[in-house]
């Protein structure tokens, strides 16, 4: 059984064709600059690159070229489109309606449209991608896998904001959380590595990329997470501010005469470690600058590590203890220095790190010592595989 996994952005599209017998990706690809001059599709099969450069006016044209690349006689991996048993779509926001992945039909599409107001940047391209696939592959079942779904198990006191209750009732203003597919995947792998049932464990998962969030997992369920109504909340990130005093936004508008759009640009695109360092949103650049004596770069890293450490401490309280901490995503998987700094100060939990093991980059590994009371893992995330597994399970029913 082969499943196509699609992740549509506003001008890009990532895809993988996964053989579910071996759970291996037969092909991985990226389409860039959709609707912009210089559109390009890059597909990788067994390390070999295949590139298509031609105009792609919309996502439908992009998906046409994806299917063309997959069945290409020389560079493709399937002989016919009928080999694609189902398509799994990453959808950022499922609102309160969806606590798990779902088979797509017209009713689901309407619900996704209703969620656009909650994710105006992300849901529209997700919907466009689904519509294009449904048009080009009308007989192939489609499944929506939501970033928010895993966090629908948060208790009401964890997701409710202390605002007038009517704002929740009438406008859906509450904590939703994101990166759910990643948190779900790495927590399940951690339990496998420990040889225990996830339902018997308390796990804190740290998805640390340009966007970053933490999740507290208890009895296999998300009970707390750092992102909120939007992916702006929580930790300091690459370009996002994370949690700040909300009155700062009013100050920016009233005193600095900034428009709501200007404020939005500042808190979403000009803040985080980029804003503090003035160097970059790329942690490799900031680490390099800090090593060369750039004080603002060092401060940016200190603030970032502090917000992660602070949140791990809070989630240990939420869980009433912790059995395992997992690092994943770009920074979590690849920066030994950041992992060390984040855990520095959590010795009271009985965490002991093996310095040699911690030097490993991008590999699935336990980095805690044998006598560490809390297991610490680095687990490369695989959201595409999780989407494919959900798609297989739902279409098999």
Curated annotation (Swiss-Prot):
Q: Which cofactor does it need?
A: Mg(2+); Mn(2+)
Which residues does the record give as ATP binding sites? 14, 207-211, 282-284, 330-334
Which positions in this protein are listed as binding Mg(2+)? Answer: 7, 383
Q: Which UniProt keywords apply?
A: ATP-binding, Cytoplasm, Kinase, Magnesium, Metal-binding, Nucleotide-binding, Transferase
* Record: residues binding substrate: 90
**UniProt main location, coarse:** cytoplasm
Gene Ontology CC = cytoplasm
Under catalytic activity, the entry for this protein gives: acetate + ATP = acetyl phosphate + ADP
Q: Name one Pfam family in it.
A: Acetate_kinase
Query: If you read the UniProt record, what top EC class would you report for this enzyme, in one word?
Result: transferase
Annotated GO MF terms: acetate kinase activity; ATP binding; magnesium ion binding
PROSITE patterns (alphabetical)? ACETATE_KINASE_1 (PS01075), ACETATE_KINASE_2 (PS01076)
Any binding details for the cofactor?
Mg(2+). Can also accept Mn(2+).
Q: Which PANTHER family match?
A: ACETATE KINASE, ACETATE KINASE-RELATED
What NCBIfam families does the entry give? ackA
Q: What HAMAP family does the database record attribute to this sequence?
A: Acetate_kinase
Question: What function does the entry list?
Answer: Catalyzes the formation of acetyl phosphate from acetate and ATP. Can also catalyze the reverse reaction.
Q: What is this protein called?
A: Acetate kinase
Protein's organism: Clostridium botulinum (strain Kyoto / Type A2)
State the taxonomy lineage: Bacteria, Bacillati, Bacillota, Clostridia, Eubacteriales
Name the encoding gene, please: ackA
């Amino acid at each position: 059984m082969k499943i196509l996994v699609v992740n549509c952005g506003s001008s890009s599209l990532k895809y993988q064709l996964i053989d579910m017998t071996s759970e291996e990706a037969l092909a991985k690809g990226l389409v860039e600059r959709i609707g912009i001059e210089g559109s390009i599709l890059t597909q990788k099969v067994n390390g070999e690159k295949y590139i298509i450069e031609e105009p792609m006016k919309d996502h439908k044209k992009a998906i046409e070229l994806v299917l063309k690349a997959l069945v290409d006689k020389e560079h493709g991996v399937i002989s016919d489109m009928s080999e694609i048993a189902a398509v799994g779509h990453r959808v950022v926001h499922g609102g309160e309606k969806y606590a798990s992945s779902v088979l797509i039909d017209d009713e689901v599409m309407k619900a996704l449209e209703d969620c656009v107001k909650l994710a105006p940047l992300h849901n529209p391209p997700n919907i466009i991608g689904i519509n294009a696939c449904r048009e080009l592959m009308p007989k192939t079942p489609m499944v929506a896998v939501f970033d928010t779904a895993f966090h629908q198990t948060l208790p009401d006191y964890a997701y409710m904001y202390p605002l007038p209750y009517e704002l929740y009732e009438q406008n859906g203003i509450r904590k939703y959380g994101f990166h759910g597919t990643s948190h779900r995947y790495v927590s399940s792998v951690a339990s496998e590595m420990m040889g225990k049932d996830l339902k018997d464990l308390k796990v804190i998962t740290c998805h640390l990329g340009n966007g970053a969030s933490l999740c507290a997992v208890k009895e296999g369920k998300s009970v707390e997470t750092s992102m909120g109504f939007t992916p702006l909340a929580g930790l300091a990130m690459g370009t996002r501010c994370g949690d700040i005093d909300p009155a700062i936004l009013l100050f920016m508008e009233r005193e600095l005469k900034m428009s709501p759009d200007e404020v939005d640009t500042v808190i979403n695109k000009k803040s985080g470690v980029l804003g503090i360092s003035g160097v970059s949103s790329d942690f490799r650049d900031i680490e390099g600058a800090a090593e060369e004596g750039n004080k603002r770069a060092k401060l940016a890293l200190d603030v970032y590590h502090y917000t992660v450490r602070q949140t791990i401490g809070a989630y240990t309280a939420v869980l009433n203890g912790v059995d395992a901490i997992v690092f994943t995503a770009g920074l979590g998987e690849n920066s030994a220095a950041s992992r060390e700094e984040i855990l520095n100060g959590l010795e009271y939990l009985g965490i002991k790190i093996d310095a040699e093991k911690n030097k490993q980059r991008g590999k699935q590994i336990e980095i805690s010592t044998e006598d560490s009371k809390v297991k610490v893992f680095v687990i490369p995330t695989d959201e595409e595989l999780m989407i494919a597994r959900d798609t297989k399970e739902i279409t098999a029913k």
